[in-house]
């Protein structure tokens, strides 16, 4: 047989086989909706990890290989029941399938993969969430302690009470043993007749002349500003959400026992994580119980915590500090102006 006859005899058959293979490949690519497949493949290029290595990282909950954004993307692109059924029923050569289908097939090897991915996401974010909770609760507890133990603040409050009793002398309010917190903010609104001087200016002036060491009382309350930005209700909700998340992880651990060898590493990592996480959540919950004593801060000022919660106490005190500092600065500025004016007048007297 000549080479020409050989080519003529077999080339057409070979070309038909190639066409059939291309047809099968194109047909395979259409197993998943084209747009869905394209979006999935775009996601995979961003992850850029071999599929087998990626799933090993998922089962090992290895946050050094996958970050939380990548995990959330994998969750978004988990195959649906319909897609899994479609691929299970596919009888062609799976090696010819597209990247999306290959990814779905790899994911399908892991039982309950979406739940495992969510557990992985929870694990990655847990450390940051606990750190933020600890930071917030410590700020609340520190602020409460600082306010209750500040001797300078107590003395300033005593001076304000004394001023109020003098102003109300001869009335039923002239022998008060305390005052409402909101009264702290009224000091800046109460002016002397025919004068720009307010009660706050007067308070600062008296303290500057007789007890100047009290003027920096705000330094005793360093945690107040950070604590004022914290909502105790939000902290409680976050702790509750984390606690519920751990409950789901315990259920996930139990469910994975029936997975067999494929989830062996996952079970060990998850079990160790749950043990550590439950200890940290217990510590945070205990700290929150102490933080709930923030209600005692309202009682400390004679207020009802139901009407004057921690957040309102801290914002009122911060406003008082701001108004106090402003009044003192204005007093100092006015004193300098008066001093310069007196100096000029004295100089003019000399030149007469």
UniProtKB/Swiss-Prot annotation:
> InterPro entries, from UniProt?
FH2_Formin, FH2_Formin_sf, Formin_homology_domain
- According to the entry, every stretch annotated as the FH2 domain falls at 1-350
Pfam families the UniProt entry points to: FH2
Protein family membership: Belongs to the formin-like family. Class-II subfamily.
PANTHER family, A to Z: FORMIN-J, FORMIN-LIKE PROTEIN 15A-RELATED
Can you name this protein?
A: Putative formin-like protein 15b
Q: Where is the organism placed in the taxonomic lineage, from the top?
A: Eukaryota, Viridiplantae, Streptophyta, Embryophyta, Tracheophyta
């Amino acid at each position: 047989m000549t080479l020409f006859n050989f080519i003529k005899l077999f080339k057409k058959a070979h070309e038909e086989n190639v066409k059939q293979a291309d047809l099968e490949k194109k047909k395979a690519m259409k197993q998943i909706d084209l747009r869905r497949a394209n979006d999935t493949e775009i996601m995979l290029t961003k992850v850029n990890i071999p599929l087998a290595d990626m799933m090993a990282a998922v089962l090992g909950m290895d946050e050094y290989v996958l970050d939380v954004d990548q995990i959330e993307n994998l969750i978004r692109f988990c195959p649906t029941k319909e897609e899994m059924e479609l691929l299970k029923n596919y009888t062609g050569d799976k090696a010819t399938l597209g990247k999306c289908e290959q990814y779905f097939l790899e994911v399908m090897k892991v039982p309950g993969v979406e739940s495992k991915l969510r557990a992985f996401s929870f694990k990655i974010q847990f450390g940051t969430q606990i750190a933020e909770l600890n930071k917030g609760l410590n700020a609340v507890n520190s602020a409460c302690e600082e306010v209750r133990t500040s001797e300078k603040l107590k003395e300033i409050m005593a001076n304000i009470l004394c001023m109020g009793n003098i102003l109300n002398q001869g009335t039923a309010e002239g022998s008060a043993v305390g005052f409402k917190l909101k009264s702290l903010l009224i000091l800046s609104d109460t002016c002397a007749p025919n004068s720009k001087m307010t009660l706050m200016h007067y308070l600062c002036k008296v303290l500057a002349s007789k007890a100047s060491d009290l003027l920096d009382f705000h330094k005793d309350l360093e945690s107040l500003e950070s604590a004022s930005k914290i909502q105790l209700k939000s902290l409680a909700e976050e702790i509750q959400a984390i606690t519920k998340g751990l409950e789901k992880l315990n259920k996930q651990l139990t469910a994975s026992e029936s997975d067999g060898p494929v989830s062996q590493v996952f079970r060990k990592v998850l079990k160790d994580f749950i043990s550590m996480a439950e200890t940290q959540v217990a510590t945070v919950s205990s700290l929150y119980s102490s933080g709930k004593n923030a209600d005692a801060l309202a009682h400390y000022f004679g207020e009802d915590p139901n009407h004057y919660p921690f957040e309102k106490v801290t914002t009122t005190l911060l406003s008082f500090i701001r108004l106090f500092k402003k009044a003192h600065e204005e007093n100092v500025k006015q004193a300098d102006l008066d001093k310069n004016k007196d100096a000029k007048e004295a100089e003019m007297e000399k030149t007469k």
